């Protein structure tokens, strides 16, 4: 669950990639409404409520999900082939007691990783002894040396930016949450010496070592993942928090995102787990600037695309142009021959309910090539652990909007492939001049328009 440096420097109080605020009466479901919303309710009323429904499984690769949340009741995936608590791999998939998903951030003892380093700190730790004690000229043509130099410079720059704020800790200038964030950055996220993997006991560079972790689909900090799950699947019409976008969906919780940067291996295996266990949509509300094993993640993305699984990814919260600044994982590049993978991987920017220039969320990444569509990601009121609700914002919230739309459309048009669903979503956006040049469609996802397009194709 990456927390964004830029957001912190710009405003200490809004330093997180998802931001707390209070829900306002009458705005709980603005994202499903008209205006800058997705016209979800119109689609239900005029088209979708009249059609039979088939349940769709959506994998949420995230920090974990509170599978007992009151507003997710009936919408959590259950592995019917697995017998709970018998400590056996009943279905033979290699994962023991994976009842509601899998946790790649734990061990067989039931212990779990919470905090982790940023990837750039891991790179510094791994290569420092090699490159710092050698002749720089000797490594001039070594691509890992270049990666190490970039990672080291970035870590040092971040520490320098944080230094003035660290001096203010304990002086009553910050609230408890902000102080904890600052301490986490220095003690864990930006600390090359912090070991975030020994508890798990695997080799994070050995992608053939697959069967680690445990069946705890919630983990120690499921706030982010639970909110994401609620946007997709919260019970509709019960006046408990915001309504989920989809009404006939099961959430498969795959825990692979700590408080820090996710490991490439965990992401790649999480994608493959989702595909192999029946998910048709995968939501990925995370990202990072360095990815030393990105080709392995690309292989997993290609595998998902080959199985007709649609991947939805948050564009990121650095207010940056991702055509120029990498945000991993990403779709295959334009000049690479993996066209199917590129088409089946959507990057999502975040819009607000405001008009004009304020329509684009000030934190949202953008890109005329790499970002596909925008979706509501500001002031989103939905589920958090312990059957509670909070208002959060970020492209982390925009991505599950689109994942929910994809699941909803697939549930009503089961004959459609996920490629059909993807094309319907991207070709029917509601265009806004404010989004021209910020994404390749120039618009916000519109459920009603997409449903009409599919209705014509699959009568």
Question: Model-derived features: where do they sit?
Answer:
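Positively charged n-region of N-terminal signal peptides that target proteins for export
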Residues: 1-5
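Bacterial N-terminal signal peptides
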Residues: 7-17
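Boundary at the C-terminal end of the N-terminal hydrophobic targeting segment
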Residues: 17-23
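Short acidic, glycine-rich surface-loop motifs adjacent to enzyme active sites
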Residues: 23-28, 117, 135-153, 159, ...
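Subtilisin-like serine protease catalytic core
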Residues: 44-57, 65-263, 340-344, 366-370, ...
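Active-site glycine-centered loops adjacent to acidic/histidine catalytic or metal-binding residues
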Residues: 62, 316, 394
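C-terminal subdomain of the subtilisin-like protease fold in secreted/lumenal serine endopeptidases
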Residues: 275-277, 281-284, 295, 341-347, ...
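Extracellular S/T/G-rich loop segment that most often corresponds to the catalytic His/Ser-adjacent loop
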Residues: 309, 331-411, 415, 419
């Amino acid at each position: 669950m990456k927390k964004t440096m830029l957001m912190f420097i710009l405003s200490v109080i809004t330093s997180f990639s998802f931001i707390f605020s209070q829900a306002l009466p009458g705005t709980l479901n603005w994202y499903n409404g008209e205006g800058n919303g997705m016209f979800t309710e119109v689609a239900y009323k005029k088209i979708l409520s009249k059609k039979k429904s088939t349940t769709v499984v959506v994998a949420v690769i995230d920090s974990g999900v509170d599978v007992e949340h009151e507003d997710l009741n009936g919408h959590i995936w259950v592995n019917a082939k697995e017998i709970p608590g018998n400590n056996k791999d009943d279905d033979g998939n290699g994962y023991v007691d994976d009842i509601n998903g899998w946790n790649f951030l734990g061990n067989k003892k039931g212990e779990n990783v919470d905090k982790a380093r940023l990837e750039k700190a891991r790179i510094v730790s791994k290569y420092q002894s090699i490159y710092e004690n050698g002749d720089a000229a000797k490594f001039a043509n070594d691509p890992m040396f270049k990666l190490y130099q970039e990672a080291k410079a970035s870590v040092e720059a971040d520490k320098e930016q944080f230094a003035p704020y660290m001096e203010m800790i304990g002086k009553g200038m910050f609230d408890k949450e902000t102080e904890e964030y600052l301490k986490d950055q220095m003690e864990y996220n930006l600390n090359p010496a912090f070991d975030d993997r020994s508890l798990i006991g695997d080799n994070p560079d050995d992608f053939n070592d697959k069967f680690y972790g445990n069946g705890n689909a919630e983990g120690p900090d499921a706030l982010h993942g639970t909110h994401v799950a609620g946007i997709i699947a919260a019970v509709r019409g019960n006046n408990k928090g915001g309504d989920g976008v989809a009404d006939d969906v099961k959430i498969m919780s795959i825990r692979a995102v700590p408080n820090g940067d996710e490991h490439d291996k965990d992401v790649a295996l999480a994608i493959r787990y989702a595909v192999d266990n029946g998910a048709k949509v995968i939501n990925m509300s995370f990202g990072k600037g360095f990815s030393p094993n990105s080709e392995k993640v690309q292989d997993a993305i290609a595998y998902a695309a080959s199985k007709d699984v649609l991947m939805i990814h948050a564009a990121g919260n650095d207010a940056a142009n991702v055509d120029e600044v990498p945000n991993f994982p990403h779709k295959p590049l334009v000049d690479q021959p993996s066209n199917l993978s590129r088409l089946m991987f959507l990057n999502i920017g975040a819009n607000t309910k405001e008009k004009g220039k304020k329509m684009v969320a000030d934190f949202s990444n953008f890109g005329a090539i790499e970002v596909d569509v925008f979706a509501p990601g500001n002031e989103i009121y939905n589920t958090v652990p312990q059957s509670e609700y909070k208002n959060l914002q970020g492209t982390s919230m925009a991505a599950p909007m689109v994942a929910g739309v994809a699941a909803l459309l697939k549930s009503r048009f089961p004959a459609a492939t996920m490629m059909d669903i993807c094309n319907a979503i991207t070709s029917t956006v509601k265009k806004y001049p404010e989004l021209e040049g910020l994404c390749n469609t120039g618009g916000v996802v519109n459920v009603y328009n997409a449903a009409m397009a599919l209705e014509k194709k699959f009568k």
